[in-house]
Amino acid sequence: MSGRGKTGGKARAKAKTRSSRAGLQFPVGRVHRLLRKGNYAERVGAGAPVYLAAVLEYLTAEILELAGNAARDNKKTRIIPRHLQLAVRNDEELNKLLGGVTIAQGGVLPNIQAVLLPKKTGQAAASSGKSGKKGSSQSQEY
């Protein structure tokens, strides 16, 4: 006989994604397709999408970890854009990488210039007894 047919044939192995082979969560196949369709180069090597997916996954995990810490510090269980902003701007390297990026609904970092803070005159206030109350501060309170 010719040897063709359904009997005795080798069973096809279960398909394994390139992401699972590389131990990644990010889609290597999709990154490869986007690299080809994006006209970045005439040809795209097999290792390039794996490397790029790994880098993207690492950066995402780093930002999400810091944002999760910021959410926990604010006693929240859900990460909002404000937490992403705090995470990125408080980290020196991520702030440099994403310096030109605006995060919608992120707000700004709380910051008061030292010049604008009231003067600390603990010695002068204690020595001059002009005030009627003991230890009253000279700062304005409304």
Swiss-Prot record:
N6-lactoyllysine: residues bearing it: K10
Biased composition (Basic residues): 7-19
Protein name per the record: Histone H2AX
Record-listed N-acetylserine modification sites: S2
Subcellular location: Nucleus; Chromosome
Species, as recorded: Danio rerio (Zebrafish)
GO biological process, one term: DNA recombination
Keyword Disulfide bond tagged: no
Modified residues (Phosphoserine): S2, S139
Family label: Belongs to the histone H2A family.
Domain of life: Eukaryota
GO CC annotations on file: centrosome; chromosome; nucleosome; nucleus
Summary of subunit composition and partner proteins: The nucleosome is a histone octamer containing two molecules each of H2A, H2B, H3 and H4 assembled in one H3-H4 heterotetramer and two H2A-H2B heterodimers. The octamer wraps approximately 147 bp of DNA. Interacts with numerous proteins required for DNA damage signaling and repair when phosphorylated on Ser-139.
Chain residue numbers at which the record places covalent cross-link Glycyl lysine isopeptide (Lys-Gly) (interchain with G-Cter in ubiquitin): K14, K16, K120
Function (record text): Variant histone H2A which replaces conventional H2A in a subset of nucleosomes. Nucleosomes wrap and compact DNA into chromatin, limiting DNA accessibility to the cellular machineries which require DNA as a template. Histones thereby play a central role in transcription regulation, DNA repair, DNA replication and chromosomal stability. DNA accessibility is regulated via a complex set of post-translational modifications of histones, also called histone code, and nucleosome remodeling.
Motif extent ([ST]-Q motif): 139-140
Xref: SUPFAM superfamilies: Histone-fold
Domain comment quoted from the record: The [ST]-Q motif constitutes a recognition sequence for kinases from the PI3/PI4-kinase family.
PROSITE patterns found in the cross-reference section: HISTONE_H2A
